[in-house]
Amino acid sequence: MRSQDLHQRLADLGAKPLHCGRIVRAWLQGRALDACTARQPAEDFLPLGVRHGLPQVAAELEGIARLHSEHPASDGSSRLLVELADRQMVESVLLPRGGLCVSTQVGCAVGCVFCMTGRSGLLRQVGSLEMVAQVVLARRRRAVKKVVFMGMGEPAHNLDNVLEAIDLLGTDGGIGHKNLVFSTVGDPRVFERLPLQRVKPALALSLHSTRAELRRQLLPKAPPLSPEELVEAGEAYARRVDYPIQYQWTLLEGINDSLEEMDGILRLLKGRFAVMNLIPYNSMDGDAYRRPSGERIVELVRYLHSRGVLTKVRNSAGQDIDGGCGQLRARATQGTAERRIPARQA
């Protein structure tokens, strides 16, 4: 089911646009579909046919996604394992201070070497209402004021569904445009389409290295944009929407944590409308990568910040409960057979 399908379903029951808007807003807030106001109860506002049909619509919406399990962490975050209608699993993460990270694909075709999700390949796309349903489930647990599309999957490979979800959340969902964050490895289609949208989200770009060859090794199936081209495209979007680009950099000890790389960041980002997010690597079973020491991370932040690049450390939420993206799902689906979608269909 997509957004237009939901509106058509309600229209078939006799709902006018005003009724549809109120019903959809109630769902997006995690409330009952017939939730109205103290001054105007449902029986005074919704047509009889709509009221009679809402229980079935509610059941259909509940069937889009359900909470399989919740895993609270010591840092105030909570990782949600969400089961979709076909029993596929995705992860979303409730973050401190009202944030939520949602998944846009089951699996991923980019194959980043430091990401658990990429190990499974792409299994299927997540529909727009399946993304929104992750927000609904989260809002039933705590307030959600910011949604980042940084969970499982590459949003640019599911662009229509992601943009539809962003539009719905940025209008009826009541989330400010700057508080909707589209994360991508840098697909050119993103830079073409985002400026044309009614809801223009903030943008996070996966950089990870200023050396083109190393970046290709770390993100083997990312579009062939050089780091310089990626930053130029990001800067153009930032100036158009008037909020900075977030550049993502997973810190891997001995690989991309050298001062030479930090100087490369200064060369690319100094004077740009940008924030550099350094993300200490979250280890996975059976890999050879490690995060730098805490002292080294502090040194790198100070090095960049003191030379004119706003730099923050973004630790993976819930590190004590399989905090890296895709790790919780991998543990839950261990031993089950899964069919991958070839990368060319991504």
From Swiss-Prot:
SUPFAM superfamilies attached to this UniProt entry: Radical SAM enzymes
Keywords of the record: 4Fe-4S, Cytoplasm, Disulfide bond, Iron, Iron-sulfur, Metal-binding, Methyltransferase, S-adenosyl-L-methionine, Transferase
Subcellular location: Cytoplasm
Residues forming the catalytic site: 91 (proton acceptor), 325 (s-methylcysteine intermediate)
Cellular component, GO, one term: cytoplasm
Family the entry assigns: Belongs to the radical SAM superfamily. RlmN family.
Cross-referenced PANTHER family: 23S RRNA METHYLTRANSFERASE, RADICAL SAM CORE DOMAIN-CONTAINING PROTEIN
Protein name: Probable RNA methyltransferase PA14_40730
Organism expressing this protein natively: Pseudomonas aeruginosa (strain UCBPP-PA14)
Lineage: Bacteria, Pseudomonadati, Pseudomonadota, Gammaproteobacteria, Pseudomonadales
